[in-house]
Amino acid sequence: MNYAVLPPELNSLRMFTGAGSAPMLAAAVAWDGLAAELGSAASSFGSVTSDLASQAWQGPAAAAMAAAAAPYAGWLSAAAARAAGAAAQAKAVASAFEAARAATVHPLLVAANRNAFAQLVMSNWFGLNAPLIAAVEGAYEQMWAADVAAMVGYHSGASAAAEQLVPFQQALQQLPNLGIGNIGNANLGGGNTGDLNTGNGNIGNTNLGSGNRGDANLGSGNIGNSNVGGGNVGNGNFGSGNGRAGLPGSGNVGNGNLGNSNLGSGNTGNSNVGFGNTGNNNVGTGNAGSGNIGAGNTGSSNWGFGNNGIGNIGFGNTGNGNIGFGLTGNNQVGIGGLNSGSGNIGLFNSGTNNVGFFNSGNGNLGIGNSSDANVGIGNSGATVGPFVAGHNTGFGNSGSLNTGMGNAGGVNTGFGNGGAINLGFGNSGQLNAGSFNAGSINTGNFNSGQGNTGDFNAGVRNTGWSNSGLTNTGAFNAGSLNTGFGAVGTGSGPNSGFGNAGTNNSGFFNTGVGSSGFQNGGSNNSGLQNAVGTVIAAGFGNTGAQTVGIANSGVLNSGFFNSGVHNSGGFNSENQRSGFGN
């Protein structure tokens, strides 16, 4: 703020209104109290560890304990000093404010000057008041200068106090890690790369959880910042499986959403409230379009169920601006047929060849579906990558070829997946067999990395748990090509683990390239016994390419025992099917 150009009416008023210096003085008292408590804690902590190591507990272990405890006692002392410094600077700011207010012209004096000036101007007959007007204006200019000088002094004092403050983070960064295999400082856990993480296998800072890539996440397996939950890609999500690689989501509350600021699950788009909507600002379930309130609507700004068009109010209308039931056309009011589409069996369907209620898509079996060939309730179905739109089996899916509930991606088998070709729950990545994975080609849970077999891995091609490095077999490794626990360096390679014949493998008895897990014969696989020739698969006993699950022989499938192409679910031998036994 450039207070030099502000008149004394504003500068004086601002200095004499508000809370004054009382809050800053209260803050100084609080900082003084904190400094005293921290100082007492530092003294007690140091005394206890010293007495323990010199009396009741002696030997190398006691010496190691004392050495590990010393930095924490030092941090408590440093924090006490910083708190005392903050108290002193708060008092300095309060003093600067009081001095500035004492030097500031009182608002009543400024108002009196302006009132006198106005009176003299209004009564200035024949210029007789000119000398008095000049004197009053001169006094006003002096008030202006006095206020500006007071504000300059206040700004200088407050700035000097702020410059004296030392961030607490500097002291925290000097703390050692409590755990093994960490690269960084002040981590409470193992296998972290970064600072101030509480958990294992994180890449980033201040995460509370495991297997995160990013900062300040509360949960596990997230890629991004400030997420609460698991397996999210993006920032500030509350839930699991939101966003996906290349399409991060932010501010979602729920699971498996693709987009931003959705409240619910399985939505594709922004600011939807409900389940399985495709579009923006929808309230309800299975709507395809924007601004719809209800279920199974295709179009925009519809209120009701199963409408196909724009601005309809009611059930099963086809057209625009209709109010009623089963109407076909535009701007009609009343009741038409039970269905406004063709070849439908049921009530209030506006699509074609539907069986059920309130469907606005085509070939659906169920209630409130707005895309094609869905079986279930409230599916909207958007085209995801190479996969056809719709063809979901379940509830509240906005993606394509999903089997389950609340999936916004494609070819998922499970619940709340925002990614594609996953088997499990809350995955925002791709080709995962497990749950809450934000990475890709993982077999396990809460992995934000790629190609891991195990849990809580933020690294790549690890077999085990909580690894933030590359191609490790074991746990809590931040390095690469290590076999064991807590390693931060690089092993000899070309593999880690035991009995591997290929290169860049971790785990046991793999013969391919770039795999993790057990007895994989293909390349870039994770899991167990994926066959020779299988490429980019996750799970168990797969023989197909880019498949996820158990014993799939087809291509781009998720689930169990699928032999076709683009299938989710189980026991499917045809192509582009969701569900079971197709």
Swiss-Prot record:
Signal peptide: 1-27
Lineage top rank: taxon: Bacteria
Segments of this protein annotated with the region Disordered: 241-278
GO biological process, one term: response to host immune response
InterPro entries: Mycobac_pentapep, PPE_dom, PPE_sf
The keyword Signal is annotated on this UniProt entry: yes
Entry keyword annotation includes Signal: yes
Ranges of compositional bias, category Low complexity: 258-278
Record field: compositional bias (Gly residues): 241-257
UniProt-listed SUPFAM superfamilies: PE/PPE dimer-like
Membership in a protein family: Belongs to the mycobacterial PPE family.
Protein name: Uncharacterized PPE family protein PPE62
Organism: Mycobacterium tuberculosis (strain CDC 1551 / Oshkosh)
